[in-house]
């Protein structure tokens, strides 16, 4: 949901801070673990509500709208989508690659259960601060859990990848659904979550 009492200048400061952070990742492209200092900075970015939510992901083709939390703790993944903390924040820009993780097949929540129904050419949107970032799916891969090469930043590209376990119920591999940034067609709007995410409370994902 949009946070009131933030003006355009403050939004721009928030965007700049997140983009600066993403630029810093380019100097450490193969670091998969953040330092304590990096973790503190990371957790503070895009968290205007003070509840760990950095935005929302909308996937129209499978009727999904879920909050995106900092990090991929199990307490997050049980009820929402988590952002891999060593990847780019979801603010777009050339030389960025945001990776979002979600569970499938949980009895209590749908989450990324229907991700396998998506196909190349479908779109998904990230609602972040006062903007919408739209991505068109251009690649769907099935990989071993330890294969992180497809998640790395590609110079000059603006990418976002959704990741979940597969095959359904076995979970021996990972499905990577990647999109490249395209022009958004819709205006930012108030977010109203009525499905899985309604159960989320800040204390459930507190450190």
Label the model's feature ranges.
Residues 1-207:
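Solvent-exposed, non-transmembrane regions of membrane-associated and secreted proteins
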């Amino acid at each position: 949901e949009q946070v009131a009492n933030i003006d355009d200048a403050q939004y721009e400061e928030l965007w700049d801070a997140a983009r600066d952070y993403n630029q810093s990742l380019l100097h450490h492209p193969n670091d998969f673990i953040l330092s304590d200092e990096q973790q503190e900075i990371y957790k503070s970015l895009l968290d205007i509500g003070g509840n760990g939510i950095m935005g929302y992901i909308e996937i129209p083709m499978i009727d999904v709208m879920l909050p995106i939390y900092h990090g991929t703790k199990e307490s997050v993944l049980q009820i929402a989508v988590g952002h891999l903390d060593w990847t780019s924040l979801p603010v777009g820009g050339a030389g960025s690659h945001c990776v979002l993780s979600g569970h499938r097949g949980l009895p209590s929540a749908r989450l990324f259960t229907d991700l396998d129904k998506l196909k190349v050419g479908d779109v998904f949107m990230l609602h972040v601060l006062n903007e919408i970032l739209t991505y068109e799916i251009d690649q769907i891969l099935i990989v071993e859990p330890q294969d992180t090469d497809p998640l790395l930043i590609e110079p000059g590209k603006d990418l976002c990848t959704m990741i979940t376990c597969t095959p359904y119920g076995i979970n021996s591999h990972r499905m990577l659904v990647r999109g490249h940034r395209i022009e958004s067609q819709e205006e930012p709007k108030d977010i109203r979550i009525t499905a899985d995410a309604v159960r989320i409370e800040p204390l459930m994902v507190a450190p």
